């Protein structure tokens, strides 16, 4: 009898769990399952996909929203429109710019304003996990790069493709987080590149991260050095690549009950700052279905070095490799004082735990020429991700950028 009851329980408990999951799980938004091009189409916008190859062989995928949701007229097609290039941050993708409803998402807001919108994807993420000869699943060399190479190779390849297809000579660049750091580095090391950038809008701009708060501060202090040594010893590898398993975990945790959804939101906020009424907790399952989108462990090690050393050092590969690459034992520092000829607009917040005011004061505010910085916008009560996912980011950030571009384009 006891054996029969035990057998019955063995069958019934899994069935009860399945029934509970099916009856009480919340419906997940459609965008949970869609990739970026599919998501753009689902909102009624046109989308185009392009590939570009970097000088070191990485194949990067670009997503273009050529027009707004309204059907373009023949004059719209024939007339040149402002080209705006949007570049995501660390472990992110082109999804970030279309993550919310059209009136809240930068990609859609700019398209509806009449701009030719391009969304970039850095090497190693969901959409740019390709190379002319290296296999990301078999060749460790595929992952042997830091954000130095992203700045040196990815930005010119992607922006060059956008200019080639659009027929323009220069464009408006909007970067978020790592998308700002890499552009600052590019402009400081390649002054001629400034000819391709009409204006540069930096959201949650990164100079140094020595004074970061939250979980990143804890991890950097207690595990940063060990992580750097591990990467130096064992080599770089894929870091937090997107996977079907992770999506399922997100769906059946963050997307299951309101309490778990709130828990997932709280975990996210430990890294970036506090929430407010402009933080859409109900979208967390969708955000986490697309983020993290993958990168190289060398990039994380490089960020750890920035936290440890201060300033903006190039990647420290160890004395022997540093001597070969840089001609000196220690990695040289980037210097932003020489950036010229590109009007820069900074959008930042005192409440951002990754792009802190103290770090901005010690790097970007201190080094950038005052004539180059034509706007510095302090946004109240914004954490790091509010700049791309905040429900009022359109009014606080994107509409400001739109006004600046339209005024510039009409002069």
Swiss-Prot record:
Optimum pH is acidic. Transmembrane segments: none annotated. The keyword Glycoprotein applies. One of its GO terms (cellular component) is cytoplasm. Its EC number is 3.1.1.-, 3.1.1.3. Induction: Up-regulated in the intestine by fasting. It comes from the Eukaryota. Residues 1-27 form the signal peptide. It catalyses: a triacylglycerol + H2O = a diacylglycerol + a fatty acid + H(+); 1,2,3-tri-(9Z-octadecenoyl)-glycerol + H2O = di-(9Z)-octadecenoylglycerol + (9Z)-octadecenoate + H(+). This is Lipase lipl-4. It comes from Caenorhabditis elegans.
